[in-house]
Amino acid sequence: MKAEVECRWNGGMSFETEMDGHKIVIDATPEVGGKGLGPRPKPFMLLALAGCTGMDVISILNKMGQKVSWFNVRVESEMTEEHPKHYSSYHIVYEFKASDDLNRKKVDKAIVLSQDRYCGVSEVLKKASPVTHQVDYI
């Protein structure tokens, strides 16, 4: 399946696109010539990873008959200092509500399935940098 994204320059450091009917604006911070009209581009990689694996995990848990009332996915990463600046590692923190009647082995299995089989974003990022994870029950 072919994919394509087009970004239109808005002047300065700002670019705009439309994806699935949603307008997205990216921009740089004022320190580097932007106006802060939108997020910077690199954090979208973290969002893509969190969203991709989060959707996998919740879908798998639903199919396993698990009832989830609260779920959060956070991705922590380190940016290199030298150019080209990039994320050198990714650490995914899956957070669940501790009071939910969740089978923790099924949670672990859902995460492993996402990371090893379904999450294409994770698969791409693993080719360049380590991707690790942990599960927290809050």
Q: Model segments located where?
A:
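Extended beta-strand/beta-hairpin segments
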Residues: 1-47, 58-138
